[in-house]
Design a protein with these regions (language model features):
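Calycin-type beta-barrel ligand-binding domains and close structural analogs
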Residues: 1-203
Length: 203
Protein backbone atom coordinates (compact mmCIF):
# COMPACT_ATOMS: atom_id res chain seq x y z
CA UNK A 1 0.00 0.00 0.00
CA UNK A 2 2.66 2.42 -0.84
CA UNK A 3 3.62 4.35 -3.81
CA UNK A 4 4.13 2.04 -6.72
CA UNK A 5 3.33 -1.05 -4.66
CA UNK A 6 -0.47 -1.08 -4.80
CA UNK A 7 -2.69 -1.19 -7.88
CA UNK A 8 -4.78 1.94 -7.34
CA UNK A 9 -3.53 4.95 -5.41
CA UNK A 10 -3.32 8.71 -5.28
CA UNK A 11 0.07 10.13 -4.37
CA UNK A 12 0.31 12.99 -1.95
CA UNK A 13 3.70 14.60 -1.76
CA UNK A 14 4.36 15.65 1.79
CA UNK A 15 2.08 16.34 4.71
CA UNK A 16 -0.80 18.79 4.93
CA UNK A 17 -1.16 20.31 8.37
CA UNK A 18 -4.19 19.13 10.32
CA UNK A 19 -5.12 19.31 13.98
CA UNK A 20 -6.43 16.28 15.84
CA UNK A 21 -9.66 16.94 17.75
CA UNK A 22 -12.57 14.81 18.89
CA UNK A 23 -14.28 15.72 15.60
CA UNK A 24 -11.35 16.53 13.33
CA UNK A 25 -11.73 18.69 10.26
CA UNK A 26 -9.41 17.65 7.46
CA UNK A 27 -7.17 20.22 5.92
CA UNK A 28 -7.77 20.05 2.17
CA UNK A 29 -5.26 18.11 0.11
CA UNK A 30 -4.42 20.48 -2.73
CA UNK A 31 -3.13 19.11 -6.04
CA UNK A 32 0.45 20.09 -6.74
CA UNK A 33 1.30 22.54 -9.47
CA UNK A 34 3.14 20.29 -11.88
CA UNK A 35 5.93 22.63 -12.88
CA UNK A 36 9.49 21.53 -13.61
CA UNK A 37 10.56 21.91 -9.98
CA UNK A 38 7.72 19.73 -8.69
CA UNK A 39 8.34 17.02 -11.26
CA UNK A 40 12.07 17.04 -10.52
CA UNK A 41 11.40 16.55 -6.78
CA UNK A 42 9.86 13.18 -7.52
CA UNK A 43 13.26 11.82 -8.49
CA UNK A 44 15.43 9.96 -6.03
CA UNK A 45 15.14 7.60 -3.09
CA UNK A 46 12.05 7.14 -0.89
CA UNK A 47 11.34 4.97 2.16
CA UNK A 48 7.88 3.63 2.99
CA UNK A 49 7.00 4.36 6.62
CA UNK A 50 3.39 3.37 7.41
CA UNK A 51 -0.13 3.14 6.05
CA UNK A 52 -3.77 2.28 6.71
CA UNK A 53 -6.61 1.19 4.44
CA UNK A 54 -10.32 0.38 4.51
CA UNK A 55 -9.90 -2.12 1.66
CA UNK A 56 -9.24 -5.62 3.08
CA UNK A 57 -6.90 -6.85 0.29
CA UNK A 58 -4.73 -3.77 0.75
CA UNK A 59 -4.65 -4.34 4.51
CA UNK A 60 -3.41 -7.88 3.84
CA UNK A 61 -0.69 -6.52 1.52
CA UNK A 62 0.44 -4.02 4.14
CA UNK A 63 0.73 -6.73 6.77
CA UNK A 64 3.02 -8.70 4.46
CA UNK A 65 5.13 -5.64 3.68
CA UNK A 66 7.78 -5.40 6.41
CA UNK A 67 9.95 -2.72 4.80
CA UNK A 68 10.27 -1.08 1.40
CA UNK A 69 12.23 1.54 -0.49
CA UNK A 70 11.76 2.82 -4.01
CA UNK A 71 13.88 4.98 -6.27
CA UNK A 72 12.59 7.09 -9.15
CA UNK A 73 14.88 7.66 -12.13
CA UNK A 74 14.54 9.73 -15.32
CA UNK A 75 13.08 7.76 -18.22
CA UNK A 76 13.79 7.93 -21.92
CA UNK A 77 11.14 10.55 -22.58
CA UNK A 78 10.07 13.81 -20.98
CA UNK A 79 7.72 13.32 -18.02
CA UNK A 80 8.44 9.58 -17.94
CA UNK A 81 10.16 7.92 -14.97
CA UNK A 82 11.55 4.46 -14.26
CA UNK A 83 11.04 2.97 -10.79
CA UNK A 84 13.06 0.44 -8.79
CA UNK A 85 11.35 -1.03 -5.72
CA UNK A 86 13.13 -3.06 -3.03
CA UNK A 87 10.90 -4.61 -0.39
CA UNK A 88 10.68 -7.35 2.20
CA UNK A 89 7.47 -9.34 1.90
CA UNK A 90 7.32 -11.40 5.08
CA UNK A 91 10.74 -13.14 5.00
CA UNK A 92 11.59 -12.62 1.34
CA UNK A 93 13.32 -9.64 -0.24
CA UNK A 94 12.01 -8.70 -3.67
CA UNK A 95 13.35 -6.30 -6.30
CA UNK A 96 11.09 -4.85 -9.00
CA UNK A 97 12.56 -2.60 -11.67
CA UNK A 98 10.16 -2.82 -14.60
CA UNK A 99 7.55 -0.20 -13.72
CA UNK A 100 7.21 3.31 -15.16
CA UNK A 101 5.49 6.53 -14.18
CA UNK A 102 4.01 8.96 -16.70
CA UNK A 103 3.32 12.55 -15.63
CA UNK A 104 0.31 14.47 -16.96
CA UNK A 105 0.91 18.05 -15.92
CA UNK A 106 -2.45 19.54 -16.92
CA UNK A 107 -4.34 17.71 -14.17
CA UNK A 108 -1.55 16.78 -11.70
CA UNK A 109 -2.00 13.12 -12.59
CA UNK A 110 0.55 10.31 -12.54
CA UNK A 111 -0.01 7.00 -14.31
CA UNK A 112 1.94 4.04 -12.94
CA UNK A 113 2.48 1.11 -15.32
CA UNK A 114 3.60 -2.34 -14.16
CA UNK A 115 3.37 -4.94 -16.90
CA UNK A 116 -0.21 -4.95 -18.19
CA UNK A 117 -1.54 -3.09 -15.15
CA UNK A 118 -1.92 0.67 -14.92
CA UNK A 119 -3.14 2.96 -12.16
CA UNK A 120 -3.76 6.69 -11.98
CA UNK A 121 -2.59 8.95 -9.19
CA UNK A 122 -3.00 12.59 -8.26
CA UNK A 123 0.05 14.33 -6.85
CA UNK A 124 -0.76 16.62 -3.91
CA UNK A 125 1.20 19.63 -2.74
CA UNK A 126 3.19 19.81 0.49
CA UNK A 127 6.60 19.17 2.04
CA UNK A 128 9.17 18.22 -0.58
CA UNK A 129 10.77 15.51 1.58
CA UNK A 130 7.62 13.49 2.29
CA UNK A 131 4.94 11.52 0.47
CA UNK A 132 1.44 10.94 1.77
CA UNK A 133 -0.33 8.46 -0.46
CA UNK A 134 -4.09 8.65 -0.71
CA UNK A 135 -5.64 5.78 -2.63
CA UNK A 136 -9.10 4.59 -3.52
CA UNK A 137 -10.54 1.17 -4.30
CA UNK A 138 -14.24 0.33 -4.58
CA UNK A 139 -15.24 3.35 -2.47
CA UNK A 140 -12.59 2.49 0.14
CA UNK A 141 -9.93 4.98 1.11
CA UNK A 142 -6.40 4.54 2.38
CA UNK A 143 -3.42 6.66 3.36
CA UNK A 144 0.26 5.85 3.54
CA UNK A 145 3.40 7.78 4.37
CA UNK A 146 6.83 7.69 2.73
CA UNK A 147 9.85 9.89 3.37
CA UNK A 148 13.36 10.53 2.13
CA UNK A 149 14.81 8.74 5.18
CA UNK A 150 13.54 6.01 7.53
CA UNK A 151 12.96 8.62 10.24
CA UNK A 152 10.36 11.38 10.36
CA UNK A 153 10.05 14.13 12.96
CA UNK A 154 7.51 14.06 15.76
CA UNK A 155 5.68 16.96 14.13
CA UNK A 156 5.52 15.21 10.77
CA UNK A 157 4.23 12.03 12.38
CA UNK A 158 1.57 13.94 14.32
CA UNK A 159 0.38 15.60 11.13
CA UNK A 160 0.04 12.24 9.39
CA UNK A 161 -1.79 10.77 12.39
CA UNK A 162 -4.20 13.71 12.27
CA UNK A 163 -4.89 12.94 8.62
CA UNK A 164 -5.57 9.30 9.53
CA UNK A 165 -8.17 10.41 12.06
CA UNK A 166 -9.64 12.86 9.55
CA UNK A 167 -10.23 9.97 7.18
CA UNK A 168 -11.90 7.80 9.80
CA UNK A 169 -8.98 5.62 10.88
CA UNK A 170 -7.95 4.76 14.40
CA UNK A 171 -4.24 5.11 15.03
CA UNK A 172 -3.99 1.43 15.90
CA UNK A 173 -5.18 0.60 12.37
CA UNK A 174 -1.97 2.04 10.90
CA UNK A 175 0.60 -0.62 10.01
CA UNK A 176 4.19 0.53 10.54
CA UNK A 177 7.34 -0.81 8.90
CA UNK A 178 10.70 -1.10 10.67
CA UNK A 179 14.24 -0.37 9.39
CA UNK A 180 15.40 -3.56 11.13
CA UNK A 181 13.54 -5.46 8.40
CA UNK A 182 15.40 -3.72 5.58
CA UNK A 183 16.79 -6.06 2.94
CA UNK A 184 20.47 -6.81 3.65
CA UNK A 185 23.28 -5.63 1.44
CA UNK A 186 24.76 -8.14 -0.97
CA UNK A 187 26.93 -10.70 0.81
CA UNK A 188 25.23 -10.46 4.20
CA UNK A 189 23.74 -13.53 5.81
CA UNK A 190 19.97 -13.77 5.76
CA UNK A 191 17.49 -16.09 7.39
CA UNK A 192 15.99 -19.17 5.80
CA UNK A 193 13.56 -18.29 3.03
CA UNK A 194 15.05 -14.84 2.49
CA UNK A 195 16.83 -13.42 -0.51
CA UNK A 196 19.57 -10.86 -0.05
CA UNK A 197 19.47 -7.82 -2.30
CA UNK A 198 21.52 -4.67 -2.52
CA UNK A 199 19.95 -1.24 -2.87
CA UNK A 200 21.33 0.93 -5.66
CA UNK A 201 23.83 3.54 -4.59
CA UNK A 202 22.66 7.09 -4.97
CA UNK A 203 24.94 9.48 -6.75
Amino acid sequence: MLAFLIPVLSLTMGLVRAHATDSPTCAPLVPAEMDNATVHRLLGHWVYIMGASQYPPHVAEMKELKYATYTIFPGRHEDEFNVTEIMRLNETCVVRNTSKIHVFRHNSTLVHEEGQEASMAELMHSDKDLFILKHFKDNHVGLSLSARTPKVTKEQLEEFEAQLRCHGFKLEEAIITSPKDACPAAGEEVGEGSTATAEPQQG
